């Protein structure tokens, strides 16, 4: 039996796919840079070997699954080609894997990971379901009928998939290093839609998604009355959100989610619509929606002392706006402080004013240096260009996060798609030291 070797196994999709193959009984190993990523925890728990990149890792008998961040000139891929080993790109392998399942591809400019996680949680509790989530979580469930997968639009990789269903959460212009306009993004989504076998569930409040012309039914969901599935009577509370769902103007049921913001209502509505279409019991769907704890790096909350720290993947103006609004719903009486690390120079330059406008919805703004991607290490833009447009013109360094101590009782949002977590980790150490120091002072005062 072949051993599957993942080049770039710590990538979020790659880590999830490796876990799926492992669960299905295959031998799996992989390699990556010698740096800790949150995605490797699950790999280590399943005892999947992780090596540091080296051509010496590549031997006879391996099948290579190559991450899309790595070119054909990568040392391991070159060695594999020299040995005439099979080399398959991640998205192409996944496209082959989902055949034979009732597959559900979740895509959209924003909300893919959260919606895939929610769908996997709900459907997986009702019927056997395998899933691949973009937070590095994957499961190859035995006897699975369904396969839920996050489908990334970047470089049109999702066109390797021919799913049974697709959920399209929205269309927005992102990845400006590849997509030239929102029309370019739309064309990619419509092409995917034409490969779907059974039905597409699309946000009907989205102007771009309303333009879709497909051969399969399009089931629209949203807040507007023109949608087949409509969310009404939304009640936003500090413990979550309640709403009613109407199907073709007929009351379906009332639902409750432990999540915040309109975007999470819409994510849930897409899952409700698909479950209804598949005939899954509405009472079970209601029950599972109430217990979803979220996915990694999506409004992940840590309470330290009197402050609330939130880790979130938001890296586009629309996502930052949604995260700030969600924080205001859950913590209406607290100050909101945004700590943001822009991801890629191209995206930062393209959406500079949009970033400023979204960040300024927070009460205070702190900016980290721009995180260059593997494809783009430098640019002729600096973080100062964005700082000049935001409240306070604050730039924060990893070694000086103590500046955030001046906001007691605040919610600190650490946002970005790079390694903004290291800023939160540094600040948590500062907070721990502060808490210990305060305890010492209290004891001294008592004595």
Curated annotation (Swiss-Prot):
Listed Pfam families: Mur_ligase, Mur_ligase_C, Mur_ligase_M
Enzyme Commission number(s) of this protein: 6.3.2.8
Cellular component, GO, one term: cytoplasm
Localization in the cell: Cytoplasm
Keywords, alphabetical: ATP-binding, Cell cycle, Cell division, Cell shape, Cell wall biogenesis/degradation, Cytoplasm, Ligase, Nucleotide-binding, Peptidoglycan synthesis
Main subcellular location: cytoplasm
GO biological process: cell division; cell wall organization; peptidoglycan biosynthetic process; regulation of cell shape
Binding site for ATP: 108-114
Any one Gene Ontology molecular-function term assigned to this protein's record: ATP binding
Catalytic EC class: ligase
InterPro entries hit by this protein: Mur-like_cat_sf, Mur_ligase_C, Mur_ligase_C_dom_sf, Mur_ligase_cen, Mur_ligase_N, MurCDEF_pg_biosynth, UDP-N-AcMur_Ala_ligase_MurC
Highest taxon of the lineage: Bacteria
HAMAP family: MurC (MF_00046)
PANTHER family: UDP-N-ACETYLMURAMATE--L-ALANINE LIGASE (PTHR43445:SF3), UDP-N-ACETYLMURAMATE--L-ALANINE LIGASE-RELATED (PTHR43445)
Family: Belongs to the MurCDEF family.
Functional summary from the UniProt entry: Cell wall formation.
Protein name listed in UniProt: UDP-N-acetylmuramate--L-alanine ligase
Native species: Listeria innocua serovar 6a (strain ATCC BAA-680 / CLIP 11262)
Gene that produces this protein: murC
């Amino acid at each position: 039996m072949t051993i599957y070797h993942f080049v770039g196994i710590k990538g979020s999709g790659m880590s999830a796919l490796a876990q799926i193959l492992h669960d299905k009984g295959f031998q799996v190993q992989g390699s990556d840079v010698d740096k800790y990523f949150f995605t490797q925890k699950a790999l280590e728990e399943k005892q999947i070997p992780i090596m540091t990149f080296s051509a010496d890792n590549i031997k006879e008998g391996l099948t290579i699954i190559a991450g899309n961040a790595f070119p054909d000139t990568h040392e391991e891929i070159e060695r594999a080609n020299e040995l005439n080993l099979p080399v398959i790109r991640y998205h192409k392998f996944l496209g082959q894997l989902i055949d034979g399942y009732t597959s559900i591809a979740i895509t959209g400019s924003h909300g893919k990971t959260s919606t895939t996680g929610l769908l996997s949680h709900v459907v997986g509790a009702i019927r056997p379901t395998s899933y691949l989530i973009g937070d590095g979580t994957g499961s190859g469930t035995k006897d699975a009928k369904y396969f839920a997968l996050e489908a990334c639009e970047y470089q049109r990789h999702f066109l390797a998939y021919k799913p049974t269903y697709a959920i399209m959460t929205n269309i927005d212009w992102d990845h400006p290093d590849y997509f030239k306009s929102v029309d370019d993004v739309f064309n990619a989504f419509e092409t995917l839609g034409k490969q779907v076998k059974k039905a597409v569930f699309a946000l009907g409040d989205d102007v771009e998604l309303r333009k879709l012309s497909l051969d399969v039914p399009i089931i629209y969901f949203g807040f507007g009355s023109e949608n087949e599935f409509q969310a009404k009577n939304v009640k936003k509370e500090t413990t979550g959100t309640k709403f009613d769902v109407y199907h073709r103007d007929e009351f379906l049921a009332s639902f409750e989610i432990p999540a915040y913001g309109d975007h999470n209502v819409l994510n849930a509505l897409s899952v409700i619509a698909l479950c209804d279409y598949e005939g899954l019991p509405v009472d079970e769907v209601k029950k599972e929606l109430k217990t979803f704890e979220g996915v990694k790096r999506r409004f992940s909350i840590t309470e330290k002392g009197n402050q609330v720290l939130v880790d979130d993947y938001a890296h586009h103006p629309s996502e930052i706006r949604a995260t700030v609004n969600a924080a205001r719903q859950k913590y209406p009486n607290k100050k909101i402080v945004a700590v943001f690390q822009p991801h890629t120079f191209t995206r930062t330059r393209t959406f500079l004013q949009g970033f400023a406008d979204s960040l300024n919805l927070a009460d205070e703004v702190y900016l980290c240096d721009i995180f260059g991607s593997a494809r783009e290490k430098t640019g002729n833009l600096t973080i100062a260009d964005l700082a000049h447009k935001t409240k306070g013109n604050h730039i924060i360094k990893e070694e000086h996060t103590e500046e955030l101590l001046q906001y007691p009782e605040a919610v600190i949002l650490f946002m970005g798609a790079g390694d903004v977590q290291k800023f939160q980790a540094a600040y948590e150490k500062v907070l721990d030291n502060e808490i210990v120091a305060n305890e010492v002072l209290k004891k001294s005062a008592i004595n």
